A protein has these predicted regions:
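Short, conserved charged micro-motifs
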Residues: 56-57, 131-133, 164-165, 334-340, ...
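Active-site "cap" helix and flanking loop/linker of ATP-utilizing ligase/carboxylase catalytic domains
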Residues: 237-257, 264, 274-334
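Internal nucleotide-binding/catalytic subdomain
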Residues: 155-268, 277
């Protein structure tokens, strides 16, 4: 009997378990949380109460139970545990530890970009001593960030030496590494491109633009969507270098994304990569947009089913008429969650998927996501209508009765981008 072990519950865990079960695979979920707190356990055939940090105990249990596949949802910690367990047990991982390293060390990733002349933001060397001559050589404004964290954790934007000193110390306090990146602050539009990999070949699934609500922090991307301009330019001018980079990294199977900015100098710059599914869960609406099922792809890889180039979808070459969207539910307030409203109602809409991260009683931090809603539509107007419906319906309230979720309302801007993208196709 094939047995798949899912490490914890995070984005996409339930969907991966359900798909594995549809193949007749016996599914197990493990962590030290009750099923009500680790909901993938509620859909699995079996669950264990072993913390995913306890690798030795998990290895022993996997051998005893003859586990044949190990995977996880969107959790970098659990992905690293899966890599280690698969290595010990001789099981299949979609990526190697060596390739995964470039997702976790932004400094080494930038060094690899330099090696192949891929465009990246200018770096400034700052030692832990924070010497004045080093600080004086910096061209402000800059971004300061840890090499090993994602999701905007530990990041600061600095306009002078005093801010840089504090930001450097803050980044160190957040990180397990003593390496800190100080680089030119890019200003402009942001994207990430998602790729599928099969036996060493890579194919661009989609270029995803990232939009923040005006007046809120620019890194709180409330709407991530295939609605974009500059798509043909990216596909023709930037994508070949990115594919070269991913092959240099060692991306052979699975899913990988690479983040970019188009700076004020009208040049694209690579920011970072993630050898995993994206936190905005754009892989969910790709199934409707492209006919490509990321969940199926990753579960099959974990089960040892090999893919080849013929199974990859045709790469994107221009802006899509149809849309795929991931709405990340960012907060602009903090507090204890007292009430969740509208999640079930929105989930009943055809093609809409809802991933909720919080339950009543949980703490919500300011400027952190509390959930994701994804969908695909045939037209821009349908996309805008769903976003408006989410704004009206979905609420995450704190102890003061305040809705903590940022709403996206800049539809005129989105429509202009959509029209420009399609015009560029001509």
């Amino acid at each position: 009997m094939r047995k798949l072990l899912m490490l914890g519950t995070s984005y996409a865990s339930c969907e991966m378990v359900k798909y594995a079960k549809s193949l007749g695979v016996h599914t197990i979920v493990t962590d030290d949380l009750a099923p009500e707190q680790s909901v993938a356990k509620l859909v699995a055939d079996e669950y264990w109460m072993i913390n995913t940090a306890n690798v030795d105990e998990l290895e022993k249990k996997c051998r005893e139970e003859n586990v044949t596949a190990i995977c996880c949802g969107i959790s970098e910690f659990n992905l690293e545990v899966a890599l280690e367990l698969n290595k010990r047990l001789g099981l299949k991982s979609y990526c190697t530890p060596e390739a995964w390293h470039f997702s976790r060390d932004k400094d080494d990733f930038k060094a690899l970009c330099r090696k192949i002349n891929a465009p990246i933001a200018k770096d400034f060397f700052i030692s832990k001593e924070l010497r004045d001559d080093e600080l004086d050589a910096v061209e402000y404004p800059v971004v300061v960030k840890p090499v090993d964290l994602s999701g905007n954790r530990g990041i600061s934007y600095c306009n002078n030496k005093e801010e840089l000193r504090e930001a450097y110390k803050y980044a160190l306090s957040c990180s397990k590494s003593d390496k800190i990146i100080v680089e030119k602050q890019l200003k402009g539009e942001e994207w990430y491109a998602t790729y599928a990999c099969a036996n060493g070949d890579v194919s661009l699934l989609a270029l995803n633009a990232m939009y923040a609500q005006p007046g809120e922090p620019k890194n709180c991307y409330t709407v991530t969507t295939t609605v974009s301009r500059h798509v043909k330019r990216f596909c023709n001018d930037v994508n070949p270098k990115v594919e070269e980079l991913l092959k240099e990294v060692g991306c052979t199977d699975g899913i990988v994304w690479v983040q970019f900015m188009l700076d004020e100098d009208d040049k694209f710059y690579i920011i970072e990569m993630g050898y995993r599914m994206d936190g905005e869960m754009m892989f969910m609406p790709y199934k409707d947009l492209l006919g490509f099922d990321t969940i199926k792809w990753l579960v099959e890889t974990a089960l040892g089913i090999e893919h080849d180039k013929s199974q990859l979808p045709a790469p994107q070459t221009e802006a899509f008429t149809k849309t795929a969207t991931g709405m990340e539910l960012w907060t602009n307030k903090e507090g204890t969650v007292t009430k969740l409203v509208g999640y079930d109602e929105i989930a009943k809409l055809p093609g809409v998927f809802v991933e909720n991260l919080k339950q009543p009683g949980d703490k919500a931090m300011k400027y952190r996501p509390v959930g994701v809603i994804t969908f695909a539509t045939d037209t821009f107007e349908e996309m805008a209508d769903i976003i408006k419906k989410v704004n009206e319906t979905v609420h995450c309230c704190n102890e003061n009765g305040e809705d903590m979720i940022i709403k996206y309302t800049d539809f005129d801007y989105l429509k202009r981008i959509y029209d420009e993208g399609l015009k560029e196709n001509a």
